[in-house]
């Protein structure tokens, strides 16, 4: 698995481009500088299989609309953050504009897509979704959407030739998630866990007690797990258990 980190925006967000032999990439947290992300994709001959968001804060998603316009791949964001991520509540930091919302259709990401023109599969969410009266319509137009993750647990995901688990780690925001590539011993922790620190909880939706439980969950990952946080340097779970007060205390 290949990983290219691009540090973007005034708040120096670590945007990650991840790909395997299939040359179909996952873009994690396109916070700013869409042209720089595009340059990495072009240099490595990559298409975009999906855009993964660790949480909804503006500094992590402000290049989303521009990137998605060029690469209309599915976008994944937890339901708890999708509620406010594209509203005035998300002018955090305040000098960032309100993130532009790509065309959104709330779907269940655990269901596989069906080809355009084929009938829905009875008994799945390709029939009306959770009483919302929406149908999973996988036409080209419907691919411009945000796939809302809700209750994802730690079920294995496979996108292109990449296998990973999505870990719910609320606290910094209600919908924070981490992307754990178990076979590669890599976890993208967003703003939940940093080298030597953890995410702040004084912003709207933050909760220190809930974050403590999320940190405990991450502390139980294999010690050799490489940590790529939303800001700052890389680390490992082993190093953080030895040196990070916030992880040690939980």
For the regions a protein language model found, what residue spans apply to each?
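Short, hydrophobic/aromatic-rich segments at coil-to-beta transitions
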Residues: 1-5, 154, 163-165
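Conserved beta-strand hairpin/beta-sheet module of binuclear metal-dependent hydrolase folds
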Residues: 1-44, 179-190
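Short acidic-hydrophobic surface loop/beta-edge motif
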Residues: 6, 18, 153-159
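Residue-level marker for buried hydrophobic side chains located in beta-strands
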Residues: 26, 52, 75, 188, ...
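Short catalytic-loop micro-motif centered on adjacent basic/acidic residues
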Residues: 26-28, 50-52, 166-168
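Active-site HxH/HxHxD metal-binding segment of metal-dependent hydrolases
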Residues: 33-36, 40-128, 134-157, 242-246
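Metallo-beta-lactamase
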Residues: 90-95, 113-117, 124-127, 131-144, ...
């Amino acid at each position: 698995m290949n990983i290219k980190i691009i540090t973007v925006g005034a708040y120096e967000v670590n945007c990650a481009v991840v790909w395997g032999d299939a040359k179909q990439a996952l873009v994690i947290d396109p916070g700013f500088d869409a042209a720089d992300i595009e340059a990495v994709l072009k240099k490595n001959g990559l298409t975009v299989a999906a855009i993964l968001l660790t949480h909804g804060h503006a500094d992590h998603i402000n290049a989303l609309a521009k990137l998605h316009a060029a690469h209309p791949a599915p976008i994944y964001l937890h339901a708890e953050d999708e509620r406010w991520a594209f509203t005035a509540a998300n002018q955090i930091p305040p000098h960032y504009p309100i993130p532009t919302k790509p065309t959104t259709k709330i779907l269940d990401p655990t269901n596989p897509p069906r080809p355009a023109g084929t009938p829905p599969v009875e008994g799945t969410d390709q029939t009306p979704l959770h009483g919302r009266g929406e149908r999973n319509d996988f036409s080209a137009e419907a691919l411009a959407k945000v796939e809302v993750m809700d209750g994802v647990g730690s079920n294995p995901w496979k996108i292109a030739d990449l296998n990973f688990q999505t870990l719910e780690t609320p606290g910094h925001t209600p919908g924070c998630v981490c992307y754990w590539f178990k076979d590669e011993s890599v976890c993208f922790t967003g703003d939940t866990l940093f080298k030597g620190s953890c995410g702040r909880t004084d912003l709207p939706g933050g909760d220190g007690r809930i974050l403590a439980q999320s940190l405990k969950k991450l502390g139980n990952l294999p010690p050799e797990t490489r940590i790529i946080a939303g800001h700052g340097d890389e680390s490992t779970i082993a190093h953080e258990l030895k040196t990070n007060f916030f992880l040690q205390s939980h």
